[in-house]
Swiss-Prot record:
Gene (UniProt): gmhA
InterPro entries membership: GmhA/DiaA, Phosphoheptose_Isoase, SIS_dom, SIS_dom_sf, SIS_GmhA/DiaA_subfam
Binding positions (Zn(2+)): H58, E62, Q169, H177
Lineage: Bacteria, Pseudomonadati, Thermodesulfobacteriota, Desulfuromonadia, Geobacterales
Primary site of residence: cytoplasm
PROSITE patterns in the cross-refs: SIS
Cofactor binding, per record: Binds 1 zinc ion per subunit.
Pfam families attached to this UniProt entry: SIS_2
Intracellular or extracellular location(s): Cytoplasm
Naturally occurring in which organism (per UniProt): Geotalea daltonii (strain DSM 22248 / JCM 15807 / FRC-32)
Protein known as: Phosphoheptose isomerase
SUPFAM superfamilies on file: SIS domain
Binding locations of substrate: N49, G50, G51, E62, N91, D92, S117, T118, S119, S122, Q169
Length: 192
């Protein structure tokens, strides 16, 4: 058991190293994209399924509340939280439309839409990102494996290069924390 624990920690460290080496430029680009949009009165809409839904909510909580810095709240919405909306759309239009229908209702040109998918192939996330693009939104994919079909349609794909879902999720939450930290500094300076 001890060796398995060490092996999993080693796998985690390898993923973190690859994020630092391979994804830093894309993470920096997303910070700039978000700073530009949020600094100009646009909002962020975030979605995902399962653990990725939890990550979407985590990202939004850090932006609407605060990450490390006392500051005004930032306009961000998790499309994963309203069970009445999710079940109404799922029942009437199908599960593949639970996010795209919300994007139709809430997104405006210049808003930023983030789809989180460890596989890069979640059909409901894919469809919502297509709708977001049609509406003139900027799109970001927080993905895993090879990025899947979602990587092909977003403005900025950030793909954690790993096939192991738990390691991808650990990478996603690390990237989310980095984004929140750098975004606060970019928008509000170095104050605490």
């Amino acid at each position: 058991m001890i060796e398995e624990i060490k092996s999993q920690i080693h796998s985690h460290q390898k993923v973190m190293e690859s994020i630092g080496q391979e994804l830093s430029p894309k993470i920096a680009a997303v910070v700039e994209l978000l700073a530009d949009a949020l600094g100009n009165g646009k909002k962020l809409l975030v979605m995902g399924n399962g653990g990725s839904a939890a990550d979407a909510q985590h990202l939004v909580a850090e932006l609407v509340g605060r990450f490390k810095m006392e500051r005004r709240g930032l306009p961000a919405i998790a499309l994963t939280t309203d069970t009445s909306i999710l079940t109404a759309i799922g029942n009437d239009y199908g599960f593949e439309n639970i996010f795209s229908r919300q994007i139709e209702a809430l997104a405006r040109p210049g808003d930023v839409v983030v789809g989180i998918s460890t596989s890069g192939t979640s059909k409901n996330v894919y469809k919502a990102l297509l709708v977001a693009d049609e509406l003139g939104c900027r799109t970001i994919g927080l993905l895993g494996r090879d990025g899947g079909t979602i990587a092909e349609i977003v403005d900025v794909p950030i793909t954690v290069p790993c096939d192991d879902t738990p390691r991808v999720q650990e990478g996603h939450i690390t990237i989310i924390h980095i984004l929140c930290d750098l975004l606060e500094k970019r928008l509000f300076g170095e104050r605490r």
